[in-house]
Amino acid sequence: MTSPVFGDMFTLPQPKLDSSDNTDEPHYHGLPVIDLEEDSCTLGHILSLCHPPSCTGKQFKVNNVRELRAVLEAATKYDMETVRCVALEELSKPPILREDPVRVYALACQYECHKAARLAAKYTLALPSLVREYVPDLEKIHVGKLFRLLSYREACIAAACSLAVNHRWIVHAGSLRPLFGCTDGDLGWTTVRNLPSRKYPSGREECKSAHEWWFEYMKRSECVLQRWPDANAVKDEKLVDDALAAISASKCGKCKASQVSEAFRSFVNTFAENIEHRIAEVTPIRSDLEG
């Protein structure tokens, strides 16, 4: 945990201080005091790594990204490689990633911590908007790394939206059966032509149908996913509640609202799971993170 910077400093000869000398430099018991720019919180985190927890009763634990950045800057400044490595490991911890993934991504790129950068990129997908306000840490990374983050998000958006547009992934059986197949001509419904269809030996193909409210939900889901490529986007409370309200108001003579509502809730969960799987298939940000 030693710092070569301080190690070399302590070997320098110190001038003898005479009582008659007039100096404004602070001293303690005749020894010069070195002022450090870091605050007590940052130095406390570093010292917690220099002394065993059994002696101090403290373990290295930062409370937020701001504290972690300060420790990284100090560790780099004083050439404390072990402290730097421990601090970089904190970048991959979920609490830190959830707090501000864009800022964590910038720090990970700045300090070439590729694992944390890839994790942070994935966590940014949970943000309804990638950058809601100015992030100073982005100034310290190459524009190419920011471009890769934006490209990754765009690829995830395309992957998620494809599920809202092309419905061939839907299996209209089991718990989802009540959603498809209604043929009540008095209600607004549309044939789902890109759903997996049932083919008969004669070659006739049976297309499935879905009510207009379902298509409205899928269209709105696509709009939300275009800015928020995350499984939770299609579980948005208003989005789901509006669809459930439409189910209750449809008054279909052939469909029981309670069964359709239950099937729809099951569909939403299946939709979200498929989004997670599709996004997981997107090629992650390059591990080398070159500019």
Question: Where is each model-derived feature located?
Answer:
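Extended aliphatic helical segments
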Residues: 5, 33, 62-65, 71, ...
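Long, charge-rich C-terminal accessory regions
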Residues: 129-235
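Post-BTB helical module
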Residues: 45-140
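A sequence-composition feature that detects small, non-aromatic residues
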Residues: 70, 74-75, 87, 106-108, ...
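Generic structural signal for short, flexible, solvent-exposed coil/loop and linker residues
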Residues: 23-25, 32, 38, 67-69, ...
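BTB/POZ (also called T1 in voltage-gated K+ channels) oligomerization domain detector
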Residues: 1-60, 209, 213-291
